[in-house]
Amino acid sequence: MLAEGWWSGGATYAGENWNFFGDRQSLLAQLVVTYEDGQQQTVVTSPDTWKYFNQGPVVYGSFFQGEVYDARKEQAIAGWSCPGYEDAAWKPAVEVTLENHVSQVGGGNVPKVNDYSAFHLKAQYGQTVRAIQQLTARSVEEVRPGIFVYDMGQNMVGVPEITLHGMEAGREINLRYAEGKYPDLPRYAGNEGMIMLENIRAAMAQDKYITKGGEETIAPRFTIMAIGMSRLRALTRPCPWKV
């Protein structure tokens, strides 16, 4: 599955830097397959041999804006990574050129990339992103009808994991994240108990999940959040929440 990553889309929480390298999700890959007998095969991305499918469950994914996931579409890609998968609905891949892409760079110290002639591609050399600790919400409060605020007990960077039971298909679950709640001050009258969003600037920090029905788990994979408090909307009861 493919999302914006650092390639395209919003690159900061300020909302002024977009599409540093390209304006469409793109994949450039070289896969080296090593067989049991030691022989190797190199597979590279090419419109001649690759296909794509853009009607999967991940509708949108962004580091700072969040993820939109429609679980009803999971069946459309069931088994896609297994031999024998029927890909008749998939389309031939197309080449995405780097020239003349539309970008917006507002930060004074951020260079606008429009010349790739001096670029040298290197494989990732840092550690892969992985979970190092799992936290469970310390408390949950229904601050408005159908709106639950979860207190994680500390600020951290992570992704949520919420288990849903007995859901009907097509229910939209809305999740928002913040570092704290509104203080009990006159200027914030009317927002008592709600999570405070002003300090995350232009970042939406929001996930939307559309249920497929039955038992399912919300676990975004193409976004990260600074979480201290989380708001879950469109449920009639609180659900188990981990980060």
Model-derived features with residue positions:
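Extracellular/oxidizing-compartment recognition motifs
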Residues: 1-243
